[in-house]
Amino acid sequence: MGINRDKPDYWKKDTAASIDMYNEWFMNFAPKTFRETRVSKSASVESALRVTGYLQHLSPDILKSHPEILPILRMSTCPPIARDRLVGLAGVRKSLVQNMEDTENPRVSPRMSEKTLKDELGKIVNTICRMIDSDVFVWIDEKREPDEVEVARSATIVADRLCGALSDPIIRNAQEKRQLKVISQYLDSKGYTEYKNGVKFDEMEPGTYSFRTNVQVKVSADSEQVANIPVDVLINPEGAKKGDLPIMIECKSAGDFANVNKRRKEEATKMQQLKNTFGENVVFDLFLCGYFDSAYLGYEAAEGIDWIWEHRISDMDLLGI
C-alpha cells in the first residue's frame, strides 16, 4: 500500500496545503536569511578589496593566492559578468574559472603549467580591470585610497549583486536545512539516534538515521560501472534486520511550479539506479514542501516513487518507523 502516490483524489488539496506552508515560511524567514547572507557577503567583499589594494593592485599572483575572490570580481564590473561570459570575454579555459569558483574548494587548476596559468590569470585580470564599475568604486579613476564609507558602500552594492545572483540557492539551502531539522526532530521524538560523524549506508544499526550519505549504485542495469549518489536522509527502522536496506528520503522544496517539472527526472533516474543495484524492494521516497502539482506528482507516481508531505509528517509512520 502506498503513502500518497496511490491517492490522486487528495493531491490537489495536499498541494494547496503544501503551498501555504512554503509561502508562510518564505514570508517569515526568507528576508532574514537573505539579510544574513548579505552581511556575510559584504564582509567577504571588503576582504577582497583589501587583498587587491582596493582593486588598484589586482594581479595574476593575487588571483592565484586568492581564487575565491573571482565571483566578487565578476560582480564588480559594469555590467556584472556571468561566469560563462567571463570565459568568453577573457578567452580562458572554462575549467579554470569553474575550479576558482568551486564553493567547497576554490583553487586554480592544479595540472596547468605555471606559464599557462599566469597567462590565463592575466587575461582574467585584464578583463576585470577594463570593466571595473567606476560608479561604484569611485576612488579608482581618482587614483586615491578610499575612505571607510566608500568601502562599506561599495561592498554592500557588490554583496547585493552576489545575493541577487544567488538568491534561489540561498533560499533553497535554507529550506533544505529546515526540512532536515524537521525530520531530525520527528525521528528524535521516536527515540532514533543520528549518526553525526557519518556512516556507511549498509552499516547502520536499527533505530538510527543519517543525513547526506553516499550510496553506491550501478550506473545502468547492464553496466558494472558504479557511482556514489548522495541521499538526503537514510533511516534504518527499529525492527530492521541485518542486511536490510535503510529507507531513503530525498528532501524537495519549490517556490514555483516551473522548476519542479524541469527537475523531476532527477529523482526518477536516482530511483532507477537504486533498483538496478538493489532490486525492486528499494524504499526511496520524497519529502515535499511547496509547489508540487499533479503533473509532477503523477510523473513520480508512475516511476514508483512515493512521497510524504511536510505539512503531514505523520505519514512517515507508514514507512514502519
Positions of the model-derived regions?
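Acidic-basic catalytic patches of nuclease active cores, encompassing PD-(D/E)XK
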Residues: 162-222
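A generic alpha-helix preference that emphasizes hydrophobic side chains
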Residues: 134-137, 184, 264
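Catalytic core segments in nucleotide and nucleic-acid processing enzymes
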Residues: 199-321
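Detector for Asparagine
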Residues: 4, 23, 28, 99, ...
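Short, charge-rich amphipathic segments
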Residues: 102-123, 155-160, 191-206, 229-237, ...
